[in-house]
UniProtKB/Swiss-Prot annotation:
SUPFAM superfamilies: S-adenosyl-L-methionine-dependent methyltransferases. Its main location: cytoplasm. CDD domains: AdoMet_MTases (cd02440). Keywords: Cytoplasm, Methyltransferase, rRNA processing, S-adenosyl-L-methionine, Transferase. This is Ribosomal RNA small subunit methyltransferase G. GO terms for molecular function: rRNA (guanine-N7-)-methyltransferase activity. Belongs to the methyltransferase superfamily. RNA methyltransferase RsmG family. The keyword Methyltransferase applies. It catalyses: guanosine(527) in 16S rRNA + S-adenosyl-L-methionine = N(7)-methylguanosine(527) in 16S rRNA + S-adenosyl-L-homocysteine. Specifically methylates the N7 position of guanine in position 527 of 16S rRNA. It is found in: Cytoplasm.
Length: 208
């Protein structure tokens, strides 16, 4: 099975209807990630089939949660899930923020080579990011805890915006320790094809 077929099948299993053009762009992104990873160590995952499942399909599992038009991915790494989402939603705006220069250089190259015009790459620490109160969604796979995520990103969403945290097993202790400034909306399992480990999406909003 080709990488195109694997991505297409996985997306279909999750109910994501992606055009052939979108899947082709994801295949090109995957090829760039594999190539750059050999030199710059962008991800610990080396096997391409695992990259598809653990990175691409895992990122595609978040598609139903992206209902707003202006999104920031904090600690995006090599663009997960932010670059994947930007490829799938060309009509929405994405800011891909990471303090690691190797990773943001890779993203800048992806943006240029693949023509991803709706993504802005920000090489900075989240506390230095000046666009506060502008985002419909603040999404991240990167934070060690929900508390850390909220502490670092609290000023970023609009009043009507939300926080989307991708987690592994149900994070009951982290939920119990959530800062008082946010309210828990939902915790939903993410069913990612070819991924046995538990995955959850935690949705939170800012109070007041």
């Amino acid at each position: 099975m080709t990488h195109f077929d694997t991505i297409q099948k996985g997306a279909q299993q999750m109910g994501a209807a992606l055009s052939d053009e979108t899947i082709q762009t994801l295949v090109k992104y995957l090829a760039m990630l594999e190539k750059w990873n050999k030199a710059y160590n962008l991800t610990a995952i080396r096997d391409v089939e695992q990259m598809i499942s653990l990175h691409l399909l895992d990122s595609l599992a978040t598609l139903p949660y992206i209902t707003g038009d202006n999104i920031i991915d904090v600690g995006t790494g090599p663009g997960l899930p932010g670059m994947v989402l930007a490829i799938c939603y060309p009509e929405k705006r994405f800011t891909l923020l990471d303090s690691n220069g190797k990773k943001t250089r890779f993203l800048t190259q992806v943006k240029m080579e693949l023509g991803i015009h709706n993504a802005t790459v920000a090489n900075e620490r989240v506390e230095k990011h000046s666009h506060q109160g502008e985002y419909d969604h603040v999404i991240s796979r990167a934070f060690a805890s929900l508390q850390d995520m909220i502490n670092w990103t609290l000023p970023l969403p609009k009043e009507t915006g939300n926080f989307l945290a991708m987690k592994g097993v149900y994070p009951s202790e982290e939920i119990a320790a959530l800062p008082k400034e946010v309210g828990l909306v939902s915790v939903e399992p993410l069913n990612v094809p070819n991924v046995q480990a538990e995955r959850h999406m935690v949705v939170m909003t800012r109070k007041g």
